């Protein structure tokens, strides 16, 4: 198993929870202490949870099943896409479309449409269409790619769903539970760990914490087919620190990436709206128009 230590977790700010007044009492068993109005997460329990989740993901992938990485909030999008691609798995970073798991047959139609448009452009079909028709097809392709590009090659339901921010991804969690797919998720002190098969207590806002957790799950996937093992997390994080972060992520959001809790003030909690679980379309138009 890839190495992860308390030091790794501390350096990534994994131990920082939310303000005490924002806590979910169901997270009580994962909380070590309270300092200056901030809950501190018990990292020994985080280590244990990581090991359990890591082993489960590795076993699942070894059995021939896939992992779906889900993280649609701004801090997680870049890392989720990067790590899922690194280990050859699927991901959702734009928004979760209702029915991605519970109505996968409809989603597959959208995926087929996406691939059909790509083939049309490659095989020269576009050359025989009007500019208006080509523009319409490219617009449709861009929309499908944005929403479904990360699962383009997903032929069947995944064996595991890995989630960053359970409060935001409520529909994904509900769908996974409905179809019986095990859920691995990072749960912060303001989250409800119930219903999560493999909850990992930790900071789900800091970019470095998100990166660490996602790297570990990607490593588990890769180790399933790598008898020689992988690089330790310290080296992976050195590589990550050299990457340029998305400038659209504010410094305020990165503020949780400190190790001195006395100077730490978490960002105000965001409220997330939940779309209709059965809505497999955007609010204003169909995913695959004109058919």
Curated annotation (Swiss-Prot):
PROSITE patterns per UniProt: RIBOSOMAL_S2_1, RIBOSOMAL_S2_2
CC terms in the record's Gene Ontology section: cytosolic small ribosomal subunit
Biological process annotations from GO: translation
Composition-biased stretches (Basic and acidic residues): 249-259
UniProt-listed Pfam families: Ribosomal_S2
Compositional bias (Acidic residues): 238-247, 274-291
Stretches the record annotates as Disordered: 238-291
CDD domains according to UniProt: RPS2
Keywords (A to Z) from UniProt: Ribonucleoprotein, Ribosomal protein
GO MF annotation terms: structural constituent of ribosome
Protein name (record): Small ribosomal subunit protein uS2
Organism: Treponema pallidum (strain Nichols)
């Amino acid at each position: 198993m890839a190495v992860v230590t308390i030091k790794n977790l501390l350096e990534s700010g994994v131990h920082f929870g939310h303000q005490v007044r924002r806590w979910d009492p169901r997270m009580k068993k994962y909380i070590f202490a309270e300092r200056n109005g901030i809950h501190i997460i018990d990292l020994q329990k985080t280590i244990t949870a990581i090991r359990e989740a890591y082993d489960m993901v590795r076993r699942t992938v070894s059995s021939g099943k896939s992992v779906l990485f889900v993280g649609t909030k701004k801090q997680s999008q870049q890392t989720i896409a990067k790590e899922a691609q690194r280990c050859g798995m699927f991901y959702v970073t734009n928004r979760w479309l209702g029915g991605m798991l519970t109505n996968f047959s409809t989603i597959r139609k959208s995926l087929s449409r996406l691939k059909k448009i790509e083939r049309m452009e490659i095989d020269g079909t576009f050359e025989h269409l009007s500019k208006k028709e080509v523009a319409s097809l490219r617009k449709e392709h861009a929309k499908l790619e944005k929403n479904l590009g990360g699962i383009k090659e997903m032929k069947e339901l995944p064996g595991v769903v890995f989630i960053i921010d359970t409060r935001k991804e409520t529909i994904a969690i509900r769908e996974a539970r409905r179809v019986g797919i095990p859920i691995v998720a990072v749960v912060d002190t303001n989250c409800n760990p119930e219903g999560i098969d493999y909850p990992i207590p930790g900071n789900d806002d800091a970019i470095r914490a998100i990166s660490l957790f996602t790297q570990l799950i990607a490593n588990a996937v890769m180790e399933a087919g790598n008898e020689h093992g992988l690089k330790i997390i310290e080296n992976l994080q050195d590589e990550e620190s050299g990457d340029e972060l998305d400038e659209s992520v504010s410094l305020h959001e990165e503020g949780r990436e400190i190790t001195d809790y006395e100077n730490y003030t978490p960002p105000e909690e965001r409220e997330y709206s939940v779309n209709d679980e059965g809505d497999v379309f955007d609010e204003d138009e169909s995913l695959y128009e004109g058919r």
